[in-house]
Every structure is written in structure tokens, then in C-alpha cells.
């Protein structure tokens, strides 16, 4: 016996909702009438295009999960969720279900009162060995029928700074090549996260997310049975 695979998805929904609302919380707050925003200011909430009508909502566009190890009954586990990247429409979030205690956060941005253990290098293989499952999901913000671009929403939520006028991404200035050919952003402090660093990290995650996005092409494989089928099988006897 083990934890039902179907329950992973409802658990991860909770984790992703916590993270995503935390990411855009300032955009929600600054335009909410509950926090003193005037009625005419509410119309421009969370990066919406001026003149559009309709309420904002967040929609899940798809999810894929890779199961690595079973979780035995009553076994504790942790969910670690992060924003992987974004493109012109979608936010891509990754969630790991892992053995408790394997992760040691360097800091707690929204909970500064929590104590952090001294930073130390952790064996990547040990981290991978602690993973039960990993999932990727994509979310979109809509205002009525209009898509709110992720970058616009992040700027509106004060999560990233506005791009400098005339800014162009310079790969060599922000990335370093490891001996195995991997390209990784250089380690930086939070205060150093300018658009060069942000874009380097976004593109690193997008290399994985693009494969997930390509799965939209699977819709094209439905042919309505034009070449014949094995049969029709109902789950009820009528």
C-alpha cells in the first residue's frame, strides 16, 4: 500500500496556490478596495491592460507529474514549490514532494523570525534521492478574456523592477559555463537581482518548460477514430 497517486495533485494544488498568491500579493493588495484602493483604481489591477473589463482570475492550464518513489501510509513528506520561469502567457511552477528535513533554507523571505541553520553544501545526489515526485504546472492570469502578461503582473506586484529603457540581455555578463557545458547564473544576493540575472534564470527554467509547453501538440493526435478503434467500453451497464 502507498499514497494514492491521484492525491498528489490536490496536495500540490494547495502548495502552488500558497506560492502563487504570495508572488502576486502586492498587486492584489495595492488594487484591492479592502486595502483602501479607490473604485477607479481597481479597474487597473494586477497588470491589466487599460480599458479592459471583467474580473481577474487565475487559471490552471495544465500539469504533468513524474512519480519517482512511493510514499508509504502515514509517511511524512514536504512539498517544495518554486516559480521556474514564465513566457509571454504562462507562469510555470515546479513542485517537489520530498522526505522531510533534507532541505535547509538559507533564509525565509516572508518569515524572517525563523532561524536558519549555517549554510553548507548539500550533495545534489542526496537531494535527488529524497524526491518522491516532481510536477510542473502552468498558470495564466486573465482579466475578462484578456491575458495579463506574466512580466507585467510581476512588475505590478513589485516582484521584479521595471526594465531599464533600451535594456538588452547580455548573456556573457550574467552566466558562467561549467566544465560539463551547463550554463548557470552566477550566485548573487537578492539585492543584485537586476534584469540581466532575472533573464538568465528565466531562460534556464524555460529550457525545461518549453518541453512541457510542447505537449499542447498532443491535441492534434485525436482523429475521432477515422482509422478504426478497438471497441467502445462503458463504465456502466447501459
Q: Whereabouts are the PLM-identified features?
A:
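A conserved, well-ordered hydrophobic junction motif at loop->secondary-structure transitions
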Residues: 1-8
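HotDog/MaoC-like acyl-thioester-processing domains
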Residues: 71-76, 82-238
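Short hydrophobic alpha-helical module
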Residues: 15-18, 100
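Hydrophobic beta-strand-centered segment that forms part of the acyl-chain substrate-binding groove
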Residues: 17-77, 83
Amino acid at each position: 500500500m502507498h499514497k494514492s497517486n491521484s492525491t498528489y495533485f490536490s496536495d500540490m494544488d494547495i502548495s502552488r496556490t500558497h506560492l502563487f498568491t504570495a508572488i502576486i500579493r502586492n498587486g492584489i493588495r495595492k488594487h484591492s478596495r479592502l486595502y483602501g484602493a479607490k473604485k477607479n483604481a481597481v479597474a487597473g489591477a494586477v497588470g491589466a491592460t487599460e480599458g479592459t473589463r471583467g474580473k481577474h482570475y487565475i487559471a490552471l492550464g495544465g500539469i504533468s507529474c513524474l512519480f519517482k518513489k512511493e510514499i508509504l501510509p502515514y509517511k511524512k513528506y514536504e512539498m517544495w514549490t518554486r516559480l521556474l520561469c514564465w513566457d509571454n502567457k504562462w507562469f510555470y511552477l515546479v513542485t517537489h514532494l520530498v522526505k522531510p528535513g533534507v532541505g535547509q533554507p538559507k533564509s525565509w523571505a516572508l518569515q524572517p523570525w525563523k532561524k536558519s541553520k549555517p549554510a553548507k553544501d548539500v550533495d545534489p545526489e542526496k537531494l535527488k534521492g529524497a524526491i518522491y515526485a516532481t510536477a510542473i504546472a502552468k498558470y495564466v492570469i486573465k482579466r475578462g478574456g484578456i491575458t495579463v502578461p506574466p512580466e507585467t503582473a510581476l512588475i505590478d506586484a513589485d516582484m521584479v523592477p521595471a526594465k531599464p529603457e533600451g535594456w538588452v540581455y547580455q548573456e556573457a555578463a550574467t552566466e558562467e559555463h561549467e566544465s560539463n557545458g551547463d550554463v548557470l547564473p552566477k550566485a548573487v544576493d537578492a539585492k543584485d537581482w537586476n534584469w540581466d540575472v532575472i533573464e538568465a534564470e528565466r531562460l534556464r527554467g524555460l529550457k525545461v518548460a518549453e518541453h512541457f509547453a510542447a505537449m499542447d501538440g498532443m491535441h492534434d493526435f485525436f482523429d475521432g477514430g477515422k482509422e478504426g478503434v478497438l471497441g467502445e467500453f462503458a463504465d456502466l451497464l447501459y
